[in-house]
Amino acid sequence: MNIKDLRVVKTRASINKAFITLFFEKDFDTISIKEITEYAQVGRKTFYLHYIDKYDLLDQVVSEKLTELEEICEAKKHLGLQEGTQLWFEFFENNRSFFMKLFNISNASSYKKKLLHFIEEEFKKKVPTTVATDKGLDYHLYINFISNGMIGLLDSYLNSSDNTQEQEKIPLHVSRLLSLYDLA
């Protein structure tokens, strides 16, 4: 199917919009293809031309979010650690509702693993192996440790109260923590 075809683009956008709306209104496990297609005003057959099932649709929505995050990471690579971390957390703040909901669905662990892999790959681009090996540490274990810490901090950030002052401090604390590991 030609992804550049305007009809395809509009249909996918309609399905995605319907899905996101339902995703915020209902528990993911209770969303049906019928509801998505009715809300998107497309037939079930049309839905299945674009997606295998609702899990495939969610996977593609998550992939789009990670692509956005990758673009932010690329844009921030010339910034200092604190400024770059601030941009990163702004992305998650702007998508807070989505990620809070995503991390609380029944198969959330697979999406956390996907995000973990993304974070590991970003660190591998920026952290030379000597940072770990000079300390007698295994590089992959080092990257995995830091990346899992980021997932934990991100989870805390997303689930923290609406205390704006505390939320504003998190990127600063993250950049300071990363500097402890020679990642500044």
Predicted features along the sequence, with ranges:
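An amphipathic alpha-helix adjacent to DNA-recognition modules
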Residues: 9-20, 24, 29-33, 38-41, ...
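Secondary-structure edge/capping motif, primarily at the C-terminal ends of alpha-helices
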Residues: 73-76, 99-102, 130, 157-161
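Primarily secretory-pathway and cell-envelope proteins
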Residues: 1, 44, 77-81, 88-90, ...
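Cytosolic nucleotide-binding catalytic cores of signal-transduction proteins
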Residues: 23-26, 134-138, 155, 159-161
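Amphipathic alpha-helical packing segments from all-alpha helical-bundle domains
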Residues: 108-133, 137-151
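N-terminal intrinsically disordered/low-complexity leader segments
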Residues: 1-8, 184
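C-terminal peripheral helix-coil segments that are non-catalytic and often amphipathic
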Residues: 148, 159-184
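Amphipathic alpha-helical segments used for helix-helix packing
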Residues: 87-116, 155
